[in-house]
């Protein structure tokens, strides 16, 4: 079976975005690339690689500017303590967006936006089909 191990997100400011995810979720910086079309900082929790991307502009072909391209809607982090995670998110500049699901049924997630407006969620129970979701 294939396993999801990499998510890439376009951001406005690489360092600011990296600091946010390092501070809030204790992700480790595992790499950086600076190439002709842009730059990337790679973070990881040891299982999944989160690539933060900043493109230099249009690639010189008929593709739309990557920052405006259709792509991922959001991603999620499983946390040990929902309230503590929310405190850390907001202290680092993230903004609460909305709650989704029913906490009594174990399918609850709390949605936020990072300082660039990228949507992500947190869950104490995980998501259907993952190890943490009962």
Language-model features and meaning:
Residues 75-83, 89:
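Mid-chain, well-packed structural core segment of small domains
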Residues 42, 86-134:
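Vicinal oxygen chelate
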